[in-house]
Amino acid sequence: MATNPGLFTEWPWKKLGSFKYVLLAPWVAHGWYEVATKGWREVDLGYIAILPSLLLRMLHNQAWITISRLQNARGRRQIVRRGIEFDQVDRERNWDDQIILSGILLYLGALYVPGGQHLPLWRTDGAGLIALLHAGPVEFLYYWFHRALHHHFLYTHYHSHHHSSIVTEPITSVIHPFAELVAYELLFSIPLIACALTGTASIIAFEMYLIYIDFMNNMGHCNFELVPSWLFTWFPPLKYLMYTPSFHSLHHTQFRTNYSLFMPFYDYIYNTMDKSSDTLYENSLKNNEEEEAVDVVHLTHLTTLHSIYHMRPGFAEFASRPYVSRWYMRMMWPLSWLSMVLTWTYGSSFTVERNVMKKIRMQSWAIPRYSFHYGLDWEKEAINDLIEKAVCEADKNGAKVVSLGLLNQAHTLNKSGEQYLLKYPKLGARIVDGTSLAAAVVVNSIPQGTDQVILAGNVSKVARAVAQALCKKNIKVTMTNKQDYHLLKPEIPETVADNLSFSKTGTAKVWLIGDGLDSAEQFRAQKGTLFIPYSQFPPKMVRKDSCSYSTTPAMAVPKTLQNVHSCENWLPRRVMSAWRIAGILHALEGWNEHECGDKVLDMDKVWSAAIMHGFCPVAQG
């Protein structure tokens, strides 16, 4: 929102929410009616092509978002090395409003502008006219309009909304108040209307112009330099005809320079070009030599088939909210399956997120496999190779800690990471499975005054650590699985072993639950029971009517942890899993020991370190 919002700042269809697309429905329905009644030979192809054009533009914009987020996560060629937060993502979530507005104007033009009907596929003279009118009137008028927008009155009432984003993403380019974007649309319509009135319009030329505008807008705001220097060496005048991402980035950091739309020519002739433009461009290209140094690497993986859309490089709005299954995502199953196949064939981990806390630089890398892959025996060797390759690459890049998230630390897969330590005994990076902090979170989630709990579900390394800690606190732990009870009993110190017992039934109102707990067993719990998961994955909540469920082991992160603008799987905003935080603490504290295999660090020490650095228990709803 602008500093002091003026008239027509809000979009008129804001209250429609996701139903705003119905605004285009009458024209879309009319188009299909025309096809049904007249046939493809008689119908106006230009009118019919508007809907595919809008869909293509949305895909084009999404591609830029994904590429930009992947590139900026790696830190290569990055221009502004600062983070963004959730408020920017929320502010820019309505980027498709511009597509809807453009669609409405295109439909109106195709119906009512003279010469806008029954356009041919291509006319060279029309394409040339569009290029000339854009380079002349459009660029000239935009330059002076843009300068006017930086006048105090217009800036505070309108343009400050766009400049709220210092660190830009591709789609920042179309985040403006409604009135301002209407003015831009009218400006860009000059070449199109001129072609229609002169009888030189064509479908392909119009589409190329729209794609050109989207491409240049996205490129200018992507926050990484991608224009190679050899282009300007080969054709020097290009410097005045095409801006670069670093050129426009200076406009967002300096505000009073580099006003041009896409052609810096006007900044040169009116002496508003930032003097550091060339230097920033060259320095941004130099960042290509090597990826940004990293201290902590967290290895995660894809979960469900649709989880790829919820990762940071996916759909920004989905990534900014806890993962939930949405019915309409099922309609994207062809793309989901294609993504799975492409991911499965990809032979290396990829960077999905970059964070900074104090002087510690962190990255999250995703192993290109889904959760179901980890349950396939014939996939285990390939998955281990991928994790091993990632660990070695992180170590080569100077990482101090590699934390294993989700199923990447499964005991049946790699003995909680110990397999890599045995293979590479001189490994510089510390391997951390996060058991101590995960167990500490579970123990500290138990309400004060609790004297007995029930432990149900598969007994993992975390479950064993929790059981030992609770028995030492003289809290009675009742297990519901006899076989697991006999396996765990010898691991409890003799002095407190009586605190661990087996029973098919129990009266405790606190259940510590893990994977493998079925619905029937949950229904054996009393009303008012608190279920606290110790597993990586959330349990199926079948007792929401009378019981409550905690999140999987996690903590809220402090404000000093920056560039957090996506949710970690199903966790709330600015909440991270204990396994991920454990790696961060390892680096912050400078601990030199591994936590893998059967090794568990001192839970009290790890918990105290987490609290000291500002991590907080998650408030349960």
UniProtKB/Swiss-Prot annotation:
Residue intervals of the Fatty acid hydroxylase domain: 138-272
Reactions catalysed according to its record: a long-chain fatty aldehyde + 2 NADPH + O2 + H(+) = a long-chain alkane + formate + 2 NADP(+) + H2O
Phenotype upon loss of function: Male-sterile plants characterized by small and white anthers lacking mature pollen grains. Defects in the biosynthesis of very-long-chain fatty acids (including polyesters) in cuticles and in the innermost layer of the anther wall (the tapetum). Lack of epicuticular wax crystals in the outer layer of the anther and severely retarded microspore development and finally disrupted as a result of defective pollen exine formation.
Compartmental location: Endoplasmic reticulum membrane
Tissues of expression: Expressed in panicles, developing spikelets, stamens and hulls and, at low levels, in roots, developing seeds, flag leaves and seedling shoots. Strongly expressed in the epidermal cells of anthers.
Keywords of the record: Endoplasmic reticulum, Lyase, Membrane, NADP, Transmembrane, Transmembrane helix
GO biological process, one term: cutin biosynthetic process
EC number, as in UniProt: 4.1.99.5
Top enzyme category: lyase
Major subcellular location class: endoplasmic reticulum
Membrane-protein topology: Multi-pass membrane protein
Transmembrane segment boundaries: 99-119, 126-146, 186-206, 224-244, 332-352
GO cellular component entries: endoplasmic reticulum; endoplasmic reticulum membrane; exine
Family annotation (Pfam families): CER1-like_C (PF12076), FA_hydroxylase (PF04116)
Induction: Induced by salt stress and abscisic acid (ABA).
One GO MF term: aldehyde oxygenase (deformylating) activity
Assembly behavior: Homodimer.
UniProt family annotation: Belongs to the sterol desaturase family.
Protein's job: Aldehyde decarbonylase involved in the conversion of aldehydes to alkanes. Core component of a very-long-chain alkane synthesis complex. Required for the biosynthesis of very-long-chain fatty acids (including polyesters) in cuticles, anther tapetum and pollen exine.
Name of this chain's protein: Very-long-chain aldehyde decarbonylase GL1-5
Gene behind this protein: GL1-5
